[in-house]
From Swiss-Prot:
Keywords: ATP-binding, Ligase, Menaquinone biosynthesis, Nucleotide-binding
Claim: Lyase is one of the keywords in the record: no
Stated name of the protein: 2-succinylbenzoate--CoA ligase
Stored Gene3D superfamilies: 3.30.300.30, N-terminal domain of ligase-like
Keyword field contains Transferase: no
Pathway(s) per entry: Quinol/quinone metabolism; 1,4-dihydroxy-2-naphthoate biosynthesis; 1,4-dihydroxy-2-naphthoate from chorismate: step 5/7; Quinol/quinone metabolism; menaquinone biosynthesis
Naturally occurring in which organism (per UniProt): Lactococcus lactis subsp. lactis (strain IL1403) (Streptococcus lactis)
Function summary: Converts 2-succinylbenzoate (OSB) to 2-succinylbenzoyl-CoA (OSB-CoA).
Family label: Belongs to the ATP-dependent AMP-binding enzyme family. MenE subfamily.
E.C. number: 6.2.1.26
Annotated catalysed reactions: 2-succinylbenzoate + ATP + CoA = 2-succinylbenzoyl-CoA + AMP + diphosphate
A biological process term (GO) from this entry: menaquinone biosynthetic process
Short name of one Pfam family: AMP-binding
PANTHER family: LONG-CHAIN-FATTY-ACID--COA LIGASE, NONRIBOSOMAL PEPTIDE SYNTHASE PES1 (EUROFUNG)-RELATED
Length: 451
């Protein structure tokens, strides 16, 4: 762990994670590694299951320092799903937080690690770019997960490009509210480590706690998904924030306009697990006429639009040193990565994301882009959340159906959509819900919405 050792030597008393300094975390990591070593002596790959915590970071750093590949498990999966992933990746040792140890048979809790007999070890400092650091499993269109190997080269290229784009300042303190088993949370930890700045790790979204930390100036950076930002935007003090990194799903344009009016430093971003987080970003306050874009590529990232129509809309492909070479157990994808998203580039190089290709609804030969209709629905102040999905139809192939959460009558919503939309775009049904289903990072789970 070259970066941790370096920062502990250069900035021993600087706050790193919560109230712990770089020197303290470095010391804890080395101690943890001594207790872990005899447990995993003959293991090249292990798994880690935990809620967000400083202790999770310490265990992860220790495992990485011992040159292990670490599968980061999603804490929200069932016992069956966890067992399936552990078996598929041929893992024998699973380390869990004390809260989650019962979810995995024969797992070793963080408390139990400390009871093992310590063994003196020397942690690896440098790793070749191609060495796998962590593995993250991501959903696939087939329903079976795909395993994304995150290499040290990907991480290194990401933190450098991110620093060049977002900057790094001595007083930066990034709130880690998104899950650390997900690329959105882990990338913050790695940026903070590389930049020698600070991060505050919390386990769950607590609106009052979040507002207190931001409005008191304790933290000045945060990554959020739109559903979380929608709940707190009106209550934020913009002068205490350096940036809000916003991504993870399609961002309603009315939310962006509101943030613009409030002067909130929103950095829209576009990325994925396969690219170790962001590939594209920009500050909406710097480019007020580009707010419907997701930004410009980070240094080293190239975007290609393939199979474009006459309007320049086509499939988004990426080239980047932050990209994986292949999913585990699969062939390399070649020189460019097919994102599965549809969009276009403007003359200034800004990327516009229209939809996930798999989410586009084709009804009677006409393409319906859910984002277009969702942006329209979000323009109504009564709407909290919405999602437009496809329903199979014998006559048209597919028809759009709408799911919403909000305080609005069905009649008012139907009249609004009838006035604003062509007939083929209008939802064939509207379902009201208290809250739309979401995954651990706050994305709406469209596949669970069925008519």
């Amino acid at each position: 762990m070259k970066w941790l050792k370096k920062q502990a030597e250069l900035y021993p008393q600087k706050q790193f994670l919560n109230d712990s300094t770089f020197a303290q975390i470095n010391q804890e990591v080395n101690k943890m590694a001594e207790h872990l070593a005899p447990l995993i002596d003959n293991q090249s790959r292990v798994a880690l299951l935990s809620e967000n915590s400083v202790e999770m970071a310490v265990v992860l750093f220790a495992l990485l320092g011992l040159s292990k590949e670490v599968l980061l498990l999603n804490r929200h999966l069932t016992e069956y799903e966890l067992a399936d992933q552990i078996k598929e990746l041929k893992i024998d040792k699973v380390f869990t937080s004390d809260l989650l140890t019962e979810k995995v048979t024969d797992s070793i809790s963080f408390s139990e690690i400390w009871t093992s007999n310590p063994c003196p070890v020397s942690l690896s400092a440098d790793f070749p770019d191609e060495k796998i650091a962590v593995i993250m499993n991501t959903s696939a269109t087939t329903g079976k997960f795909k395993s994304v190997p995150i290499t040290w080269g990907m991480i290194s290229n990401h933190v450098k490009a991110s620093k060049e784009t977002l900057g790094a300042y001595d007083n930066d303190n990034w709130l880690v509210i998104l899950p650390m088993f997900h690329v959105s949370g882990l990338s913050i930890i790695m940026r903070t480590l590389y930049n020698a700045t600070s991060a505050t790790v919390v386990d769950k979204f607590d609106e009052n706690q979040l507002l207190e930390m931001i409005n008191s100036g304790k933290i000045n950076m945060v990554s959020l998904v739109p559903t979380l930002l929608t709940r707190i935007a009106d209550k934020l003090h913009s002068n205490n924030l350096r940036l809000i990194l916003l991504g993870g799903e399609f961002i309603p344009q009315p939310l962006i306009k509101k943030c613009q009016e409030l002067g909130l430093p929103i950095y829209k971003t576009y990325g994925m697990t396969e690219s170790f987080s962001q590939s594209v970003t920009f500050n909406i306050l710097d480019f007020p006429d580009k707010t419907s874009s997701v930004g410009r590529p980070l240094p080293g990232v190239e975007i290609e639009i393939r199979q474009a129509d006459l309007a320049g809309v086509g499939e988004i492909w990426l080239k980047s040193p932050m990209l994986m070479k292949a999913y585990l157990g699969q062939k390399p994808y070649g020189t460019a990565f097919e994102t599965g998203d549809i969009g276009y580039l403007d003359t200034d190089g800004f990327l516009y994301l229209l939809n996930r290709r798999k989410d586009i609804i084709i009804s009677g030969g006409e393409n319906i882009y859910p984002k277009e209709i969702e942006d329209l629905v979000y323009s109504l102040p009564e709407i909290k959340e919405c999602a437009l999905v496809a329903k199979p139809d014998a006559k048209w192939g597919q028809v759009p159906i709408l799911f919403v959460s909000g305080n609005i009558s069905q009649e008012k919503l139907e009249n609004f959509l009838t006035e604003k939309l062509a007939k083929y775009k209008r939802p064939q049904s509207i379902t009201f819900m208290d809250e739309l289903p979401k995954n651990a990072s706050g994305k709406i789970l469209r596949k669970e919405l069925k008519g």
